[in-house]
């Protein structure tokens, strides 16, 4: 049996507050799961904070091929079928649907109710907040625990994972923008701060990204684990919704030409997965 330990990771400024209270102050907190050896594979292994992988033998690799993207329809939109479990309250269900619909306002992503499609996002309330990165095929779980995950910024965060995006602080150029203080990280959690080869889509590092961890993520001693450079006082991990750069990346990755033109960006001037 897999034994799970749950950690609610929040910035120091919100220590002692409930998850709901801290979110009202604009901080994003995550329920993180640590797995120990066992054979219960009913739920996927969760690595790197909130990224799901099918087994402990696989890495949460970046979405670097066209095969991990959701297909584009002839009308230029990307339709991502979804199913929401019945375990959510009506209010929570409404919040989730609003989060799904938020993508349609500024990107060509259209989350649509499941109608017998093979591949879809299966939104459930499991152990914490987590998602696979990119399209996995068939029903892929996005977990939004009823106890702490049904908030707009967290919904968008996990859906961005499902669309193919990783955490901001794992960017290949992150060392020019943040300093990682591993000496303050909980033992065994250092992998959450690994740097990976990412497609940055011609966009700058974004401290305001909804995909960015907070300053005290995984801290073992109430000291910072991520410090912006050169200005250490820049706010990170406090996004309440997708930033303009988050939106730009979605539009670039999925070639949302109409929306790129609205943002005054050329739709064909950056490298994309093959």
Predicted regions and their residues:
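Zinc-dependent metalloendopeptidases
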Residues: 2-274
